[in-house]
Amino acid sequence: MPQLIDVATAEAPYTIAQDDAAAFARAQFGNAVPHLERLMPLFTNTGIRQRRIAKPASWYQTAHGLDEKNIAYIEAATDMCADAARTLLARRGLAPTDVDRIYYVNTTGLATPSIDARLINVLGLKRTARRTPIWGLGCAGGVAGLATAARDLIGHPRERALVFAAEMCSLTFLADDFSKSNLVATALFADGAAVALVSGDDTGDVGWPIRTTRSMLFPDSLDVMGWSVVARGLQVVFDQRIPEIIAEHAAAELDALLTAAGISRNDITEFLYHPGGPKVLQAYADAYGISTDRFRWSRDVFRDYGNMSSVTVLYVLARYLQAHRPGHGGHAVVSALGPGFSSEGLLLGL
């Protein structure tokens, strides 16, 4: 079966402490949002210490058109993905021409030609590499990208795939949107990029086998999360039902994933999840009947980087893989939720 070999990350160039983000929100929302101070504790309740963003904080104080923001996305995503790929290929002793497939995941910017085409030129990847851009899966995109690569490589065991994800959530900020959803996004979201190497059975690469994958689109949930496309750009959509959906569906989804691999919850060593936020991790813990400490890798990445949408779970995997060697036994569940409303999951052999 295909294996996850390595994950490398690239950080956005600017750091913003959570206290500074809260001060920014007070200045930006203060005159337009009644009873703003009642909502401000959400900045501390997230547990986030700092985040990385693509532009200096002062840039976000004024409105920018979709064209300007999208150009900034393309530039940042291309540069950061290239940096992450160079790190990964050097660490694994691989040449760019050793890569046969390229997957590019994002939801926060638009590009035609797609970013993967730009990366072939920047990195010197094969011009015959098969390219698969994946857009619109939001926070679930990182897991979906890994799962798609793994399924494709089942029939191509001698091939290697790079799965890129790059999200510049901060660039979607609308300075004149004073909704609660935009305030919540200001407290949670950040920017980052990552790349994973997934290899077929016959490459000789040694990593963590991807044993099975699962996708689920929940009924009557299209309005739970996503974008509203407005003249000024992408306007964030959130619904308070997310913890309720987790409570209703998460346990059954976990059991279905495990059953496909012939194992049970007792066989799970690690939960490597997209953190989303504290309420999301708590809802998972309640649904599974476990402590939130089981999500420590996710919680720590969220503390240090915030929610980078599809990229976040790859940061979680990068930390875990750098601290462990393959083959010590056990299983890790990797999962994320995204627009649709949907769930993506995969099972790693450890």
Regions found by a protein language model. Name each.
Residues 1-75, 175-248, 252, 337, ...:
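Condensing-enzyme catalytic core mediating Claisen C-C bond formation in acyl metabolism
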Residues 44, 76-91, 115, 193, ...:
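Short, well-ordered amphipathic alpha-helical segments that serve as non-catalytic structural scaffolds
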Residues 46-127, 131-136, 265-281:
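Conserved beta-ketoacyl condensing-enzyme motif
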Residues 6-8, 105, 135, 161-167, ...:
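Short beta-strand segments
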Residues 1-2, 96-100, 127-130, 155-161, ...:
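Short coil/turn connectors at secondary-structure junctions
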Residues 111-118, 163-184, 212-231, 277-286, ...:
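Active-site-adjacent elements of ketosynthase-type condensing enzymes
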Residues 82, 108-109, 118-121, 126-128, ...:
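Claisen-condensing/thiolase-fold acyl-transfer catalytic domains that form or cleave C-C bonds
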